[in-house]
Amino acid sequence: MRKEASNPGSNYQDGQWNLVHLKFLTDFMEETGLTTASVAELVGISRQAVYYWFKKDNVRISMIYKLFEAYGYKIEFDLIKERPTEGEPARVEMEVERESKTGKKLEFLASALKRYNIYREEISPKMGIGTTTIYYWLSHDDVFISYIYKLAELAGLKVTIRITPNND
């Protein structure tokens, strides 16, 4: 049996979808009282399109950025190592300011590829995509979020998401 979300009129039922990639979004919606209708209005699409995101557990990352910006929040993604590999010395990574220098949404992806020596030619076949696909994502500054999670899993990385209110 599914329980209704605490926000009446949200049209989102907890447990309706088995979310992995968009769980952070439904958690945020529940915390802030956003409904699927208000999300649709903020990004300029239909409610059905938002339902489709949750049905497929996938959305273009540009839509995520657009939603959070429109709602007055900043969202930052990063890919980090969960734990050192065997034989690698343990090191404490200091929290660094990850402010985008280029303003690109996928700067975190380009940075992680470089930081962890992940080569497109090696990871692309494992992901079932062409070797130029990752280059395409970076040059067009957009990707479906499921690919970020898939790349992270194959590379032994963890997707981290930081959401903060804009202080303009």
Question: Language-model segments: which ranges?
Answer:
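A short, Lys/Arg-rich alpha-helix, primarily the initiator
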Residues: 1-32, 87-117, 162
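Residues that mark the N-terminal boundary/hinge immediately upstream of a DNA-recognition element
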Residues: 24, 35, 60-63, 119, ...
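DNA major-groove recognition helix of helix-turn-helix
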Residues: 54-55, 71, 138-139
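The alpha-helix within a helix-turn-helix
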Residues: 29, 40, 68, 124, ...
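Residues within the helices of the helix-turn-helix
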Residues: 26, 37, 110, 121, ...
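DNA major-groove recognition helix of helix-turn-helix/homeodomain DNA-binding modules
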Residues: 62-78, 145-161
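Short alpha-helical DNA-recognition segment
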Residues: 33-51, 117-135
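Short amphipathic recognition helices of helix-turn-helix/homeodomain-type DNA-binding modules
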Residues: 78-88, 164-168
